[in-house]
Amino acid sequence: MKKDALILVRGGGDLATGTVHRLWSAGLRVLVLEAEHPAAIRRQVSLCEAVYEGETAVEGLRAVRIETLAQAEEVWKQNAVPVLVDPQGKSIAPAKPDVLVDAILAKKNLGTTRDMAPLTIALGPGFTAGQDVDVVVETKRGHRLGRIIREGSAIPDTGIPGIIGGYGKERVIHAGTAGIFMDLRKIGDIVEAGETIAQIRTADGAMISVTTQITGILRGLLRSSYPVTPGFKVADIDPRKEELSNCFLISDKARCIAGSVLELVCTQLWK
C-alpha cells in the first residue's frame, strides 16, 4: 500500500463523517473540505461542526479546522482529521489526493470531475459512474444501500425519507417559510407530537412555530440563527425513544456506505 496516501473527502455531514471515521480507523490520512456555512442537522455526528467550533469529535475521532492546506500536516501528526473551508475545491489540485470522495450529498454534481484524483468516488444520486466520477455508491436505504456502481447512477432522490420505526416523511421536519431559524430544544430531547421545537423569524419580524408530527427523540436539529428557505430541512425525529444514544453515534446507513468506500480505497491503494 502506498505510504502516506491521501484521501480527500468533500463534505462533512453525517454520512460523510461515517466514511471519514472508517478511513481514519483504518489508519489512512484524510482531509475534509467543507462549505463556509454547513447546514447539517445531525450535528453531534458531523465533523463539519469543526467549521463553527474550531474542532469537534465523533466517536473518538477529532476534527480540527485549518485555514490553509499547509496546516494539515500538523493535524495529521496529532492523529486527527483537518477540515478546510473550500467549497469550490481550489485546494484539490495542490493537495494531489490519491482518492477523492464527493460526500456532499447535494443530489447533484457541484463540480467534482474524474481528473481530480486517480480514483474518484461519489455518494448518492447526481453522478454517472464512468463519466462524472469513476464509481458511485448507493445511499438509498434498502436492499441496494452501499452497492458499488461502476456504470450508471444511484437511485434518484425521491424526496421521501427512509422508514425508521414505522415513520418516513413524518420524522423529517422542513421550514415552512423563509427566515432565521431559532431553536427551542436541543438534540437528544424527547419531544411530543405537535410540540414546538423551534421558531423561524421572518423578514417582517413574525415568529413562525416549527412543530413535530410524531413523538420521539430529537436526533437532528439545524444550528440556531441559520437562514432558511421554504422546504429547508431543519430537524429529524427518531420515533424509537429508547434509542437516545443514536443521537451521538454514526448511523447504520453511514457505516454501510463507509464500508463500500473503504473497499474501493483499499483496492486502489493495493494496486
Predicted regions and their residues:
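Well-ordered secondary-structure scaffolds
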Residues: 1-271
